[in-house]
Amino acid sequence: MSVLYGIAAATVTATASFLLTAVLAALLRAPALRLAVVDRRRRRPVPLLGGVAVVLVTAVVAWAGDRAGVVPLGPAAGRLLAAATVVGALGLAADVWRLRRRWLLAGTAVAAACVVPYGETGPVAGALAVGWVALVTGAFRGLDHADGVVGTVGVVTAFGVGACAAVELMDGPAVLLLVLAAALAGFLLHNWHPARIALGACGSLFTGFLLTGAAVLARTGYGPVGGAGVLCALTAVPVADAVLVLLSRRLAGRPLSRGGPDHLAHRLRRLGLTAQGVVVVLGGAALCAVVVGVLAHTGRVGGQAALWVAGGAAAGVLGLLRVRVYGPARLRRGAGVRAPVRRAGRGARAWAVVRRPRTAMRRARAGVSQAPRGATGAAGGASFRAAIFPVRQATSTENVQVGAPLRVRNG
């Protein structure tokens, strides 16, 4: 009877979480638009308060179940839920006031330090766990760049980590992750393409922190090498997305904190996949990796199975790095800005380099020497000056075309 009672209680709790999140997310869309809490990086502004619905419903349903004695959480899951709620509040502040990433990372690390069980992991492994939780939580936030991606990956990962917790007889974290999975499923009703509302930093950080923190709790007591392999398998998709973004920006010479269309979903869309197809591919990849992680955690497969997941993720990252997402390559430092000018007496255009005066002088002399016979010295001098200072005032029928992103006006 106790088993049947537990199944019935979990089913009722998950159903309530699903329905409440679906209703609350729909209600929060209008206030988000009215307060201009929207994501403007997409083709159309998308409200960002969907994460508030996920955080509130998950916390309230789990707390109510614990208070009623239906699904007791226990002290470890209670601390995890409280810390995740604080991280979600920090993410909400980032959605409203655009906090810097360093503050989000620092706040997430402080919250993770309050959750990791140092008595069982030790100080060194505990510090590594804190760093891993903070970084992978930020990686989950990076998944919130396309419709349905972070919700789908979050649901799959929640079931996987919940299964690992259930194997360890950790009923509190298992029930908490079931409630989270149901809340994300209810949210996906509004986040499927075309999305009517998005998680934002609030929901994505809350989801990532809850999943990574529960995974650390479930793997406590195991060896560090095997534990790291299982943790990476459970979170393979967000980790691969973060590695892909960091590598591509580093190789392109872009600042790491500068956003761009360089995530997994963006590159898959450039390969021809639809928005729904991208969600299916990433969800399937997350499912395969999570299944391997759960089997490795239970001992059904050896620890080397995680290496296959890492190898597949590395191959995918290297393959997607070849997809161009930044457009034409930037001009190298010192190469100068080229601008087209007309030679005196001719219709052809000559290119002069603004930032390299010697090159401009040589090309200007060549242009003067090729001028037609009979041209006056004033015309030759005008061509010479125009090549050195190529930007000029456009007439009513001409437009100055500058071959660089920067436009310069004559003072």
Swiss-Prot record:
Topology versus the membrane: Multi-pass membrane protein
Protein's UniProt keywords contain Cell membrane: yes
Keyword Transmembrane: yes
Leading EC class: transferase
Coiled-coil boundaries: none
Predominant localisation class: membrane
Protein name per the record: Putative glycosyltransferase SCO3672
UniProt lineage: Bacteria, Bacillati, Actinomycetota, Actinomycetes, Kitasatosporales
Transmembrane feature ranges: 7-27, 45-65, 70-90, 120-140, 148-168, 169-189, 197-217, 227-247, 277-297, 301-321
An example Gene Ontology biological process: lipopolysaccharide biosynthetic process
The enzyme's E.C. designation: 2.-.-.-
A single cellular component GO annotation: plasma membrane
Family under the similarity heading: Belongs to the glycosyltransferase 4 family.
Pfam families: Glycos_transf_4 (PF00953)
Classification via InterPro entries: Glycosyl_transferase_4
GO molecular function, one term: phosphotransferase activity, for other substituted phosphate groups
Record keywords, A-Z: Cell membrane, Membrane, Transferase, Transmembrane, Transmembrane helix
Compartment(s) where it occurs, according to its Swiss-Prot or TrEMBL record: Cell membrane
